[in-house]
Structure formats: structure tokens, C-alpha cells
Design a protein with these regions (language model features):
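Catalytic or ion-translocation cores adjacent to nucleophile or general acid/base/metal-coordination motifs
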Residues: 1-9, 15-68, 73
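C-terminal accessory/tail domains of diverse enzymes
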Residues: 44-153
Length: 153
């Protein structure tokens, strides 16, 4: 399976002026990193594990995001079924969601994703499970991560 509704081997962009519920979510846990003094960071109060970075310097926000991505790609916690790699197959990535605010600057939300499968969940541990396919069978994509449901036709 793939993470979200997109293929990870190519760049994929969506744009528009809609304000999604995720953008209105507050920081639940502030984070600090002495290397990025111009970036405010925190864990978003949101159903999908998300780290928010806010800063005026696009380069500093990008560098902080790169550090988080590299750390997440190697992160495992078996108590919650997160395993970074199975052999040479990576499982962790992020869904980056960026917007610009005149007051705050660049706001980058990094939704942490894991595409690992098991015998019990062949479509993905963190994808809609079979008992919920009457509600949503497709992968959880960007729009759902940001707070809008896409119900079946």
C-alpha cells in the first residue's frame, strides 16, 4: 500500500484558498530545538499525529522539517505497531502541508505516516480496516488528513 492517496515516487501538489479544519487546530505540546531559534514547533491537537513548524525563514523551516523527516524515517515503537523498516522496505514518511500567513510566515504541518501491513491488516495497519469499508475504503489522503471527509458515492 501507499501512504495517503498519492504515489510517493513523484511530486504531487494541490492548491487553493480553502481553510481546512487542521489549519485552525492549536498546538497541544510546544517543542523546542536550539538549532532552529527562528522556528516555533509543536504537536498539533489533531487526530493524525502532526508536527507544526512556523517561521519567517523558509530555509530554516525547511531545515527543521528535514531533520524531523530523517528522524521519523528511522523511528520505531513496537508498542504502537510503528516499525520503520521491514528489511530494506521503508514504512515511515510524512505528508507535508504548507501554507503562508502574513502574520506568522511559513506554516508547515508534517503529518506522520506509516504504511506497514500485517496479515490481519493487509491494506495497512493505519489505513481504513475492512469493518469500516462501508464508510471509507480508499487510503486516507491529504484532504482527509486536513479534516474533510470524502464519503463513498
Amino acid at each position: 500500500p501507499i501512504v495517503g492517496g498519492s504515489i510517493l515516487s513523484h511530486s504531487h501538489f494541490q492548491g487553493g484558498r480553502y481553510v481546512f479544519p487542521m489549519q485552525k487546530a492549536h498546538i497541544a505540546v510546544p517543542l523546542r530545538n536550539a538549532r532552529y531559534t527562528g522556528v516555533k514547533a509543536g504537536i498539533v491537537n489533531w487526530p493524525v499525529s502532526t508536527v507544526r513548524l512556523v517561521g519567517r525563514s523558509s530555509q530554516e523551516v525547511q531545515n527543521a522539517a528535514d531533520d524531523i523527516l530523517r528522524t521519523w524515517r528511522d523511528y520505531s515503537d513496537t508498542s504502537v505497531d510503528i516499525i520503520a523498516h521491514t528489511g530494506d522496505t521503508p514504512h515511515n514518511t510524512v505528508t507535508p502541508i504548507l501554507h503562508y500567513d502574513e502574520n506568522d510566515g511559513y506554516i508547515l504541518d508534517l503529518a506522520l505516516r506509516n504504511n506497514r501491513t500485517t496479515e490481519q491488516y493487509p491494506d495497512g495497519i493505519f489505513h481504513p480496516h475492512k469493518e469500516y469499508h462501508n464508510i471509507k475504503k480508499e487510503n486516507i489522503g491529504l484532504i482527509e488528513v486536513m479534516g474533510l471527509a470524502t464519503p463513498p458515492a
